[in-house]
Regions:
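N-terminal leader/targeting segments and the immediate start of mature chains
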Residues: 2-5, 9-70, 228, 238, ...
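Short, surface-exposed coil-to-beta transition loops
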Residues: 56-60, 80-83, 154-159, 182-184, ...
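An acidic-aromatic
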Residues: 62-118, 180-186
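Beta-strand-dense domains in secreted/periplasmic systems and polymorphic toxin scaffolds
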Residues: 73, 172-174, 360
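Short, solvent-exposed recognition patches
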Residues: 74, 223, 251-354
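Flexible, processing/modification-adjacent segments and terminal tails
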Residues: 90-153, 157
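Gly/Pro-enriched, hydrophobic low-complexity segments
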Residues: 139-207
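Long, intrinsically disordered low-complexity tandem-repeat regions enriched in serine/threonine/proline
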Residues: 222-258
Length: 384
């Protein structure tokens, strides 16, 4: 009788422990769901790491969200300071490249067409929709393993989401089938009560802020140069010499400042392509058949033609800083690659990196194959 009683107690203990585990998982997800769904707006900061072959690209990330599908994602490559902004508002989706004062605009389901490691809503959807998710309690909180959805990159199969003891997302890692990290997002700040103005989701606001910042930097540089010139002249020259020197020095300083401003404008564009950049990946039975460099109005265009079983063209061309902000209507969807944000459609992949605009074009290859070629172009060209 005692043995039977002991056995029943053990069975009940197993059920209680099992039940507590399920309750713990459901309570964590319930709390996370409530937090995210109740947030009318939020602001996020963090770092994003993307692995490409043997290289790791790191971005500083800032995300702003406001209800009714307003998103602004600011991505800054920490290696070359290349900045791109993904913006969604009632007018559409934009990929903004401030360095060249240019935007691509297109109609897209982004960010709902695949997993997003830095957006809370899509992350929550991935958790809720995966009936086979795995939940685990950790010393610092909990870990949830769910399937990842990246239609254009079959290599990315699952994502590990780490939460702290207050059920705040701290880290998201996207893994391949060998459990090797390919994308990592570390959250340093999540403000679910952030009061965001509607204006920050307007393209004009982004453009105006960037231009105002550049103008302020130019004025500060000019003021400092004039101040330094006058101070040095006053110390080393007498009063009479100073009067003449000030005139000449100020003139020289103004000319120097103008030259520096002109050089600043030059740095925003690349006039020629010094090195030919070849893809590290070429489909089977495909070869380079022609290479042609042509001049255009403000730079050069390089056309590489590949023939064979899987023909395609790779076009590389210099980009020019636009004096008036240029909006280019585009068909396709956006894809965050290792070093930049690309525009992908059925026949091409297009992106800007290091003041060079790239196109991979083919009517024979799939989107996935086009992106494989694009991702293999990871060597930055030398420009002059």
């Amino acid at each position: 009788m005692k043995k039977k009683l002991l056995f029943l107690i053990m069975i009940m203990g197993v059920f209680i422990i099992s039940g507590c585990g399920k309750t713990s998982e459901s309570s964590v997800i319930k709390d996370l769901t409530k937090k995210i769904n109740n947030a009318k707006s939020y602001y996020i900061e963090g770092t994003l790491e993307i692995v490409n072959n043997e290289d790791v690209y790191t971005y500083d990330v800032k995300v702003s969200y406001k209800e009714k599908d307003n998103y602004k994602v600011d991505l800054v490559n920490t290696t070359n300071n290349h900045e791109q902004i993904i913006l969604r508002n009632k007018e559409g989706v934009y990929v903004v490249t401030p360095r060249i004062n240019k935007s691509f605009k297109f109609q897209s389901d982004w960010p709902y067409n695949n997993s997003q490691v830095y957006l809370l809503g899509p992350l929550l959807e991935d958790i809720i929709n995966d009936e086979n998710r795995r939940f685990e309690k950790t010393d610092s909180g909990s870990k949830i393993l769910v399937a990842a959805s990246y239609p254009n990159n079959s290599k990315l199969v699952k994502q590990e989401i780490l939460l702290d003891k207050n059920n705040n997302i701290k880290k998201v890692t996207v893994l391949d089938s060998n459990n090797v990290a390919q994308i990592t997002m570390n959250f340093t700040k999540i403000d679910l009560g952030s009061k965001l103005k509607d204006s920050i989701f307007e393209l004009k606001e982004i453009i105006d802020v960037k231009e105002e910042r550049e103008n302020t930097e130019k004025k500060d540089n000019t003021t400092n140069e004039n101040k330094n010139t006058n101070e040095n002249t006053n110390v080393n020259e007498n009063k009479n010499t100073n009067e003449n020197t000030n005139v000449n020095e100020n003139k020289s300083t103004n000319e120097s400042t103008k030259d520096k401003e002109d050089k600043t404008e030059e740095t925003k564009q690349t006039s020629s392509i010094e090195d030919v950049i070849y893809p590290m990946y070429i489909p089977a039975n495909t070869y380079l058949s022609n290479k042609e460099k042509v001049s255009k109005e403000s730079g050069e265009r390089l056309i590489l033609t590949f023939d064979g079983d899987n023909p395609f063209m790779l076009i590389e061309e210099t980009v020019t800083y636009e004096k008036e902000h240029l909006i280019v209507p585009t068909y396709g969807e956006l894809e965050v690659m290792a070093s930049t944000v690309a525009i992908v459609n059925d026949n091409s992949v297009n992106w800007i990196d290091n003041n060079i605009e790239y196109y991979v074009v083919s009517d024979k290859l799939s989107k996935s194959e086009l992106l494989d070629i694009a991702r293999s172009i990871s060597v930055l060209p030398v420009s002059k």
